[in-house]
Amino acid sequence: MYSAPSACTCLCLHFLLLCFQVQVLAAEENVDFRIHVENQTRARDDVSRKQLRLYQLYSRTSGKHIQVLGRRISARGEDGDKYAQLLVETDTFGSQVRIKGKETEFYLCMNRKGKLVGKPDGTSKECVFIEKVLENNYTALMSAKYSGWYVGFTKKGRPRKGPKTRENQQDVHFMKRYPKGQTELQKPFKYTTVTKRSRRIRPTHPG
């Protein structure tokens, strides 16, 4: 004969079902949070305070610095070259940046063919890049509009087209350097040492 399940068996089944539901909810929350972060990384933020920094980008491949020569882009600039001084505006908390040549006031952009070009107006999404700090301490710049396309240069300092670049290629690796003679801008963050607060002794008053 068929025997009804015991109360203990029912409780165990309910417990297992509850654990499964909790795991499903946790997985959904993790996916939703990851999607939220990715969306925020790609979305421009007009509320947060933008930061403007001045530095050079040293190309690991060419051994020189990125230059914004008007509409033409290269990586042949010497240390301190006026065309290699870049004004970098942080666009969002997700490390989106816009890069402008200080001398020419043209923006570094990547067009739909993956070619690096300079533009006088940097409001287009083609002029926004996602800054990635790599494990080797180099920085890579991926196009915010064309995912997977990176700013890259050959050994001769010529721009590489976006579709031919990958994050692990040395061609897309850069090192931030402050302009020659302006080392005072490179100030390390200073930590304040907090000492243990001494106990306050109250003065005694005669009764």
Swiss-Prot record:
Residues 1-27 form the signal peptide. This is Fibroblast growth factor 18. Pfam families: FGF (PF00167). GO terms for molecular function: fibroblast growth factor receptor binding; growth factor activity; type 1 fibroblast growth factor receptor binding; type 2 fibroblast growth factor receptor binding. One of its GO terms (biological process) is endochondral ossification. Glycans are attached at residues 39, 137. Keywords: Disulfide bond, Glycoprotein, Growth factor, Secreted, Signal. Plays an important role in the regulation of cell proliferation, cell differentiation and cell migration. Required for normal ossification and bone development. Stimulates hepatic and intestinal proliferation. Its main location: secreted.
